[in-house]
Amino acid sequence: MKTRIKEFRNRYNMTQEKLADLVGVRRETIIYLEQGKYNPSLKLAYNVAKILNTTIEDLFQLDDI
């Protein structure tokens, strides 16, 4: 899964640590999300999108199947 979390996070000058605190996860989770190594739950994806003032569809893209 490809993500645009880092792009949106940088728009708000937000660190990985700050985003993790706001979402309620560890910084490592944000790192794995940004690297595409972790597929989030719907709840986590929704919370990240809400904090970054965007939609889940704008943040996450499925890899070709």
What spans do the regions from the language model cover?
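Short, Lys/Arg-enriched C-terminal cap helix and immediately downstream tail that follows
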Residues: 8, 42-43
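Short basic helix-loop element that most often maps to the first helix and adjoining turn
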Residues: 3-22
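DNA major-groove recognition helix of helix-turn-helix/homeodomain DNA-binding modules
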Residues: 43-58
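Recognition helix of helix-turn-helix/homeodomain-like DNA-binding domains
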Residues: 25-38
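Residues within helix-turn-helix
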Residues: 17, 28, 57
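Short, charged recognition helix plus adjacent turn
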Residues: 61-65
